[in-house]
Amino acid sequence: MRVARETILIPSGHSFRVLKWQNSVRAVECITGPGRAIQMRGEGDHWHFHTEMELTLWHDGSGTRFVGDHIGTFTSGDLVLLGAKLPHYWHASGLSSGLSLQWHFPEGHPFWAFPENLALLDLFKRAGRGIRLSGQTASSVSQYLRELPVAFGTQQLALFFNILSCIVSAPPQDCTVLSLRSFNLPLESRYQMAISKAVRHLIAHFRGQVCLEDLLRITGLSRPTFARQFKQHSGRSFSAFLNHL
């Protein structure tokens, strides 16, 4: 069973991607400039991962947050930094709105030619387990995020660096690590969509009777393969995941 990989396209002329949504994380806008946006299908409402890092702010809404092996609740103002290849899923209980900032600076990228940026290496590594930001750090970062959709060019780039500067200098009490372990999932697999289907089924039916046989049918996996892949890619056994819900 395998989590779905999302392929993210950074808009031409930009170093990162800014997403904005109203009502539902399934319907997002990719901001391409002041007053300009591309409508697209959001991926945050199912179990997925991507090679890009992500910073997500929930303006309004509440629900359940899944980050690696972490399961917890979120409310308005929730702000989470996600590292590359970290599986995640937001299950909103109703209407919601928010912003996401996504970027990818692999080894050898010109971003790392600036020696000042090397201080971010440890932060990006820690983000591989997910970091919930709070306190003054969250307040400052959230304000910068809200300004991103109406900024452009060097103004937007300056906001981006302000965000990174706030997070990397945040006091420990403002940073809560979410997942017990980091993940390094393969980019391609024949199990790619199965975990997403299984998790969605569990979320939809956990208050009633959940039958393992139904999950095996949905995913098309044998019992041993299901058990092995579920734990490998969610960080929990099937029973532990279900009990935590």
What are these regions (language model features)?
Residues 1-73:
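Generic protein-terminus/edge-of-domain signal
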Residues 2-27, 84-147, 172-173:
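A hydrophobic/aromatic-rich effector-binding and dimerization subdomain
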Residues 53, 78, 88:
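Residue-level detector of short, conserved catalytic/binding motifs and their immediate flanks
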Residues 61, 77-78, 226:
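Short hydrophobic/aromatic patches on the structural cores and recognition surfaces of FHA
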Residues 69-83:
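Short acidic-glycine-tyrosine-enriched beta hairpin
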Residues 117-186, 193, 197:
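An amphipathic alpha-helical interaction segment
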Residues 179-187, 197-245:
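Basic/polar phosphate-binding segments, predominantly the helix-turn-helix DNA-binding elements
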